[in-house]
């Protein structure tokens, strides 16, 4: 099949993108719209699901128009999405009962702490591969069923939200499910997204009864779990809808798993790091679900139709690109492009370390009460030092993960494939290579998350025949090798660890 294209909807934390790819994996059209971030209280982060859906329709329509294509020119559509972000909606009206609770949202931290106090953390880890955290969908869904009650009272029916969910009147899903539902009318998720809910047993490959009971979440509201690339097809777009054609929707992957797939990390030991709002370092572990002893997550990487699940180890860093946004928020820079110029204007940070724990710390620390910290400042500190320290924090956090990854897997990564908006910054890429003392490879196509969704969708309909076809598409834009002496990198990293210690458990409750 060569006379068509594949489309990928990339629904991210800050906006929604639609990219059309050709058979070489090259971008034919790329359109994007931001959506509003809602912060109703400190530590709370919400998105409007209806705004996301409207933006999705807008970027898909604009992308096809920009490429001079009709919807019939698409062989398939794949979806990739911000993971863990949770929506509950009315099955009849299709309207959400509340804003989506975003993966960064920390409102359920105390609930997670109660799980720890009651000795349930290890059992959750055994079933899900996850560290119990407010990051995941389980406590978000529980909160919505408990606390969205006032929004429901305007409806004709006065029964509880849980009763309505048990009766099939309310549906829950991550953003992939929300988009699949609006595109096709089907209530579906894929294994990679299901594995991020803290409700899915990644060994038995099913929603877990014990977890559903713990969080009092009715099974009836959960989506059907399907392969990430599904020859059986999730559904088709409505020919009477906004596209005017019945396009098959055949794939879904959480954004980081999609990047793993787009970077063609198909074999055990292959690893990538994506630098976005947060950073996410994943290593393919094949058919083995490797348990972590060093604060990493065991997660599902992807599943192709008729094939076994492929697992991955993951290090989740909550704040990287968001730290650059913070520099803009406090007027230290005007735009992200300034960071390289400012950071390279000084040789060092002059002893300044920045720990961007604005929403707590993820792997390997898993401290929801850690907070952002700047240490080591003097009267001689200038904004260039702070900007450089912020970029260095991205590299140090990645080294945290790389060390844990090697300890858990027994595999030393020789070349780390990198992607995401921040890797356009050559200064950061070289710094990252120096700090982790590992070669970096940046691909020509930098939209690897969307590319992974497109690859998965295209495989399902025979647009590409095999994984080997995809491997042939992968091309290096630039490689980076360590230039820093290993002893210097170790010394800098040691001081980073001291700075992290000062950020931990800062946001204690009275």
UniProtKB/Swiss-Prot annotation:
Where, by residue number, does glycerol bind? 83-84, 135, 255-256
Q: In which pathway does it act?
A: Polyol metabolism; glycerol degradation via glycerol kinase pathway; sn-glycerol 3-phosphate from glycerol: step 1/1
Mitochondrion found in the keyword field: no
- NCBIfam families listed in its UniProt record: glycerol_kin, PRK00047.1
Indicate the family of this protein. Belongs to the FGGY kinase family.
Q: Where does ADP bind?
A: 13, 17, 277, 321, 421, 425
Q: Where is ATP bound in this sequence?
A: 13-14, 277, 321, 421
In the UniProt record, does the keyword Cell membrane occur? no
Which molecular function terms from Gene Ontology are attached? ATP binding; glycerol kinase activity
Question: Taxonomically, which superkingdom?
Answer: Archaea
Which residues does the annotation say bind sn-glycerol 3-phosphate? 13, 83-84, 135, 255
Q: Name one GO biological process term.
A: glycerol catabolic process
Protein name in the entry: Glycerol kinase
Record PANTHER family: GLYCEROL KINASE, SUGAR KINASE
Q: Which organism is it from?
A: Halobacterium salinarum (strain ATCC 700922 / JCM 11081 / NRC-1) (Halobacterium halobium)
What are its E.C. numbers?
A: 2.7.1.30
Its transmembrane ranges are none
Which keywords annotate this record? Answer: ATP-binding, Glycerol metabolism, Kinase, Nucleotide-binding, Transferase
State the GO CC annotations.
cytosol
Q: Which reaction does it catalyse?
A: glycerol + ATP = sn-glycerol 3-phosphate + ADP + H(+)
What is the protein's known function? Key enzyme in the regulation of glycerol uptake and metabolism. Catalyzes the phosphorylation of glycerol to yield sn-glycerol 3-phosphate.
């Amino acid at each position: 099949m060569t006379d068509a294209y594949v489309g990928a909807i990339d629904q991210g934390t800050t906006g929604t993108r639609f990219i059309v790819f050709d058979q070489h994996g090259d971008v034919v059209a790329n359109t994007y719209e931001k959506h509003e971030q809602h912060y109703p209280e400190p530590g709370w982060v919400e998105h409007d699901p209806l705004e996301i859906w409207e933006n999705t329709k807008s970027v898909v329509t604009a992308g096809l128009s920009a490429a001079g294509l009709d919807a019939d020119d698409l062989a398939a559509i794949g979806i990739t999405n911000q993971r863990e972000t949770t929506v509950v909606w009315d099955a009849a009206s299709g309207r959400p009962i509340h804003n989506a609770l975003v993966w960064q949202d920390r409102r359920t931290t105390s609930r997670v702490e109660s799980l720890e106090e009651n000795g349930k953390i290890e059992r959750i880890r055994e079933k899900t591969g996850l560290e119990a955290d407010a990051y995941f969908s389980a406590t978000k869904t529980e909160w919505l069923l408990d606390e969205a009650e006032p929004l429901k009272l305007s409806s004709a029916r006065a029964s509880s939200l849980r009763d309505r969910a048990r009766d099939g009147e309310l549906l829950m899903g991550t953003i992939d499910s929300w988009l699949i539902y609006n595109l096709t009318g089907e209530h579906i998720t894929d294994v990679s997204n299901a594995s991020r809910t803290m409700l899915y047993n990644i060994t038995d490959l099913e929603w877990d009864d014990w977890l559903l009971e713990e969080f009092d979440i009715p099974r009836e509201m959960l989506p059907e779990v399907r392969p990430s690339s599904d020859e059986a097809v999730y559904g088709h777009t409505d020919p009477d809808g906004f596209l005017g054609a019945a396009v098959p929707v055949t794939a879904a992957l959480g954004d980081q798993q999609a990047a793993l797939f787009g970077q063609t990390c198909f074999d055990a030991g292959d690893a990538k790091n994506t630098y976005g709002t947060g950073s996410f370092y994943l290593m393919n572990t094949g058919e083995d679900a490797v348990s972590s002893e060093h604060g990493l997550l065991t997660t599902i990487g992807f599943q192709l139709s008729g094939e076994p699940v492929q697992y991955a180890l993951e290090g989740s860093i909550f704040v990287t690109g968001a730290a650059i946004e913070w520099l803009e928020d406090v007027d230290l820079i005007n735009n992200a492009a300034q960071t390289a110029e400012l950071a390279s204007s000084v040789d060092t940070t002059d002893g300044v370390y920045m720990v961007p724990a604005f929403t707590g710390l993820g792997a390997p620390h898993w401290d929801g009460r850690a907070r952002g910290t700047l240490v080591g400042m003097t009267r001689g500190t200038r904004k260039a030092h702070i900007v450089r320290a912020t970029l260095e924090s991205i590299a140090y956090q990645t080294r945290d993960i790389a060390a844990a990854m090697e300890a858990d897997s027994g595999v030393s990564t020789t070349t780390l494939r990198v992607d995401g908006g921040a890797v356009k910054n050559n200064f950061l890429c070289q710094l990252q290579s120096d700090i982790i003392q590992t070669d970096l490879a940046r691909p020509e196509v930098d939209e690897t998350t969307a590319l992974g969704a497109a690859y998965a969708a295209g495989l399902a309909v025979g647009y590409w025949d095999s994984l080997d076809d995809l491997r042939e598409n992968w091309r290096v834009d630039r490689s980076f090798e360590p230039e820093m002496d290993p002893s210097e990198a170790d010394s800098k990293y040691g001081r980073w660890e001291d700075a992290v210690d000062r950020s931990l458990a800062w946001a204690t409750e009275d």
